[in-house]
Structure formats: structure tokens, C-alpha cells
Amino acid sequence: MIASAPSPSTIRWVMVTRPAPDADRLAAQVRALGFEVVMSPVIKVVWRGQVPRLAGMAGLVFTSANGVRALCHHLTVIPADVATLPVYAVGAATGAAANAAGFTNITEASGDVETLAARIKADAATLGSFSGPLLHVAGTQRAGDLAAHLDRVATVERCVLYEAQPCSSLMPAALSILKSDASAVAIPLFSPRSARLLADQFHRAGCVAALGLVIPLCLSEAVAKSAHAAGFSHARIR
């Protein structure tokens, strides 16, 4: 049994669990802070589906940066009339991806579906109503039911353009560090699903004890709750 939580001052390693290209950007930021990085993704992103007709859409909704990348992959070039549509991004990283893709009218929420829905409701109240449906570019997995939050406020058409497939195993370098010095490892976590998938990897690798030693740094309360439920003892919101 762990007597107390590991101290942040003991952290040497940061395990980056995001898929590329997010992993590379995060790793660079972590190294700039003086920590060592070990890569071990929990998911890989696969493109799928087709983009529906965009004419008549009143706006676009992205609940991850991967949604932005998926749309760009399918369209190759974002048409000018699409680039100027209102874009609702779940958080800053997704908003930055939309900006980099060429979208010019971006509203960012605070990292969860609830605040995203609140931003859309506020615009609906200002406008009176939207001129057409909102296209939600999404993956096969949903963190929340956006359409239910916006019932009677806006029509949301969900378009699945990517799938975040689980990676079954920890990378060998990550496993070695977890087995030798897990209390010196911090792990940024960005979604409830990522927390669950990472815990599954720990179990499959036979390093269950590390669940009580590593420090998960969670994007939100929802992520922290999922991490705690999955067995991580020292999850913190960062």
C-alpha cells in the first residue's frame, strides 16, 4: 500500500501517450521544461468515412484536433466558403488545429462537451436560430452526446471521419521505465478513454503496481475521475 502520493519534485520522466502529430509537439514542450520523454501511444488514428455535402451547413463542430485533421485529409483543400463558416472547437488545441487548417471564425470552449454546448447555445440565443444544421466532425468514440445537449437549440449532424483505435501494448522503453522507477513518471492524460486504455495496457504488461506510483496529469475533472476509476491512485488535474 502506498503511504503517500509521489512528489512532483521526484518526476524525471514524462510518458507521452498521444498519437502523432500531437505526441511530437507535446514531447518538444516537455523536453523544453527539462524532463526526459518516453513515447508510448494508447491510440492510433485511422481515417474513414466520407464528407457529406457541406452546402447549407451553418457551422462546423470539432470535439478533437483529429476531427480537424480528418476533414482536411478528406477535402485536401478547404474551400473558401467552408473556411469562413463558424467553427466551434472543444478546446484550445482543437481551435489551434482549426486555425492552422485555415478556418477564420473559431469559437473555443473549455475542453469538454458541456462548455462547448454552452457556447453554441449562447450564439443561438444571439442569432435567434442557426440558418441550417451544424456538422459535428467526429470519431467513432464519443466523449459526450453533443446533439442531446443542443436539443431544441440546433440541429446537429454527426459525421464520423476517423477512428481512434487502441494500441494493445506499452512500448518496450516505457515498460522498462515503469518497472524500474514508476514513481518518477508523470503521464499527461487528455480524455477519459485514454485513461482507461492506458490502465488496460498496464494490466496486460503485468505492471499493475505502477498504477499506484505514476502521476497522471489530467486535462479535466472528467479525465481525473476516469483515471481514478481505472486504478490510478494519484491522478491530478493540470
Where in this protein do the model-derived segments appear?
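Signature of uroporphyrinogen-III synthase
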Residues: 1-238
